Amino acid sequence: MSEVKFVKPKNVSGHFLKIKCKDCGNVQVVFARPSSVVTCNICGATIAKPTGGVLETSGEVIESL
């Protein structure tokens, strides 16, 4: 089983981000500084996790809102 790689997005200008799930392609809006793990509404994969600051994401950041 391969490990999912999480990265911090650069230049987060808004409070919310549109993130695309790597597993199913679903796009959902996520708070940029979450206090809990964020899972995909469609497939249940973890797409973001808290770090005490800006989130770490396993998906692709589409847009900063």
Swiss-Prot record:
InterPro entries: Ribosomal_eS27, Ribosomal_eS27_Zn-bd_dom_sf, Ribosomal_zn-bd. GO terms for molecular function: structural constituent of ribosome; zinc ion binding. Its cofactor is Zn(2+). One of its GO terms (cellular component) is ribosome. NCBIfam families: PRK00415.1 (NF001629). Binds 1 zinc ion per subunit. A zinc finger (C4-type) spans 21-43. SUPFAM superfamilies: Zn-binding ribosomal proteins. HAMAP family: Ribosomal_eS27 (MF_00371). It holds the Pfam family Ribosomal_S27e. It comes from the Archaea. Zn(2+) binds at residues 21, 24, 40, 43. Disulfide bonds: none annotated. Belongs to the eukaryotic ribosomal protein eS27 family. The gene is rps27e. Part of the 30S ribosomal subunit. It comes from Thermoplasma volcanium (strain ATCC 51530 / DSM 4299 / JCM 9571 / NBRC 15438 / GSS1). This is Small ribosomal subunit protein eS27. Gene3D superfamilies: Zn-binding ribosomal proteins. GO terms for biological process: translation.
